[in-house]
């Protein structure tokens, strides 16, 4: 596929072309886009996209590493109140279509991960063993 090959078609169909070099602004991979009939489906598909993106960026990553990444992302979304969770599609929390500033960025994820590491390191070795045993 050549660069710009589909630009004219996307524009003709009312779409928007984003240059991935960042010249049109920053692409936030943590922004949750509508990708299904309801917010739960969009959230699940978004997490799947993040999982695939991680594996693309680090193909040698073990499944445990990818799972820890997703768990950290979900904890971050919890902080930002971006988890739909309601089983009733009519009462789900809106997590898509929000202003860009409503979504965390990777710097926020890094901050959270550093907090999690500090918390683990501050525990005594027996407490750390308990944490590790319950996670496995």
Regions found by a protein language model. Give the residues of each.
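P-loop NTPase motor domains
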Residues: 7-15, 20-22, 29-136
